[in-house]
Design a protein with these regions (language model features):
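Non-catalytic regulatory/gating segments with a bias toward low-complexity or hydrophobic composition
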Residues: 61, 73, 137-138, 157-159, ...
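Short acidic/polar hinge/loop motifs at secondary-structure boundaries
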Residues: 113-141
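Extracytoplasmic beta-strand/coil segments of soluble accessory domains associated
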Residues: 70-117
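Flexible, surface-exposed loop regions and adjacent strand-edge segments
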Residues: 215-221, 256-270, 320-324
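N-terminal periplasmic "start-of-domain" segments of outer-membrane beta-barrel proteins
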Residues: 31-64, 89-92, 106
Length: 324
């Protein structure tokens, strides 16, 4: 009985060691998506990027459920934000200690295209892409963002919009909250052998948490419409050609102001708006046309060309000064 026990133990030990070795040799690699609209494409690419980079994945965005870009970016190291309107409509973002006002010292992009109204001349971001319709957010800092825009000391943020799906899919989400806050998000798309499309609409509105003494609200309304169309050749062993056209329209109507409160009024009623700012009103309109040609020879070699045209209109009527 003792001999049998001793002879069985080495066999059992060898079998367990072999299983452990097999488990150690199996490594699951993160999926890498080749896209002309993304800088990183995955957390794996972000970890292996020269310099500092961070990738907020679609799964993370879905789990967060935020419409405010400020909240999304709080998990990213080296990013500082300060609130202005409480909804992230005009965020103030600082990367690595740069000036945060209007995010004017960072490079802001959507799908790899400069999104600020005048990124080289007047980069103050009075327009910021709606975070609620994004599927990913990419942040690159330091040396890793030199190639993307005029600001090389801070970093760049690339907002990745909803991609054309590989098969038919449709999504409808609606939510409501306090202060008559409503959000409706709809998108649908499909891809065939040589053609694909995606249409998306976002409506976001609220009466706001501030109010006048006459109970008039200080809220906003936003509309955002995006359409994408893509044609491509068959994926053979040779070069693969594709062309994608993206058309977008966005507008905003808000009762926003620069006027604050005195210290005593803030301590008594922090959400009060002075009647002098009752006529303050902001309207914006943004359109975009983006054409992307991609010539892909392999997973390591591709040629990308972007053609884009953006327009931005802004009228902000606001109280300038009060004399008494």
């Amino acid at each position: 009985g003792v001999f049998i026990l001793l002879s069985w133990l080495p066999t059992t030990f060898a079998f367990a060691q072999q299983n452990e070795q097999q488990k150690d040799t199996i490594q699951k690699l993160d999926e890498v998506t080749v896209s002309a609209q993304q800088i990183l494409g995955s957390k794996f690419q972000a970890r292996n990027r020269t310099g500092s980079a961070y990738y907020i994945s679609p799964q993370e965005i879905q789990k967060m459920g935020y419409t405010d870009i400020n909240r999304m970016l709080k998990a990213v190291p080296g990013v500082n934000v300060y609130e202005e309107d409480g909804y992230g409509l005009r965020p103030n973002i600082s990367l690595r200690g740069t000036k945060a006002e209007r995010s004017e010292k960072i490079t802001l992009m959507e799908d790899g295209i400069l999104a600020a109204p005048a990124p080289y001349a007047a980069p103050a971001a009075y327009y910021f892409p709606n975070a609620a319709r994004m599927q990913a957010v990419e942040v690159v800092k330091g040396s890793s963002q030199v190639q993307y825009g005029p600001f090389t000391t801070g970093g760049a943020i690339n907002m990745v919009s909803t991609a054309i799906p590989t098969k038919f899919s449709a999504k409808l989400s609606a939510s409501s909250g306090t202060n008559s806050t409503l959000k409706t998000h709809i998108n649908a798309g499909d891809s065939k052998k040589h053609f694909g499309y995606m249409v998306e609409y976002l409506r976001y509105q609220s009466d706001g948490f501030k109010h006048f003494e006459n109970k008039q609200n200080a809220g906003f309304k936003r509309n955002d419409l995006i359409a994408k169309f893509k044609v491509n050749t068959a994926k053979t062993e040779g070069a693969n050609h594709s062309f994608e056209l993206k058309v977008g329209y966005a507008d905003e109507d808000s009762n926003e102001t620069y006027v604050g409160l005195t210290q005593s009024d803030f301590a008594r009623t922090p959400f009060l708006r002075y009647v002098g700012s009752q006529k303050d009103h902001l309207t914006t309109r943004h359109t975009q046309w983006v054409g992307t040609y991609l010539l892909q020879f392999s997973n390591r070699l591709k040629f990308t060309t972007h053609f884009y045209y953006n327009t931005f209109f802004r009228n902000w009527y606001k109280l300038e000064s009060v004399k008494y």
